[in-house]
Amino acid sequence: MRIWSLHPSLLDCRALVACWRETLLAQKVLRGLTRGYTNHPQLIRFRAYPQPLEAVAAYLAGLADEADARGYSFNRALIGAGEHGAGENGADKTESPYASVPLIPVPLGQLEYELTFLQHKVAGRDPEWEHRLNKRLAARGELAACAHPLFEAVPGTIEPWEKTKDF
């Protein structure tokens, strides 16, 4: 499971679609609707949040916004916060999903690690996207601008829950 801290516009097609599916799974886990993945490290930051389902819904909305921008069709009815299930927060795109959800801090070291990880993955599977990614990174300028809209970049190293790999 990979729930990227990076802005969805930086993710290639495979990463964006996989992140959507895996975050929908995370939403189910946080609702207690599945027995698997309950101790997955990627869920730690959402569980630490006062309203984890609302945070996951806002995160999913950010992915869906990017999907819309690319002409993909992610089912927003699957986004839902609170106890009532799917569709509660996701169907209406007119209201910003981030308006009532305080930002979650993400260390710059985590963003840097994830960006390196993404670049490594993209280099092996989609050279065309690698070129686009480099242009998008240059346009953003600083690493802090590379965070998903739900996250706020703060000083720090890689998150303790991250299972790092050498590239």
Locate predicted features.
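Short conserved micro-motifs on helix faces and helix-strand junctions that flank
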Residues: 35-37
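Conserved, mostly hydrophobic/aromatic
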Residues: 40
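Sequence termini and other peripheral, non-core segments
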Residues: 1-16, 22-25, 29-33, 47-85, ...
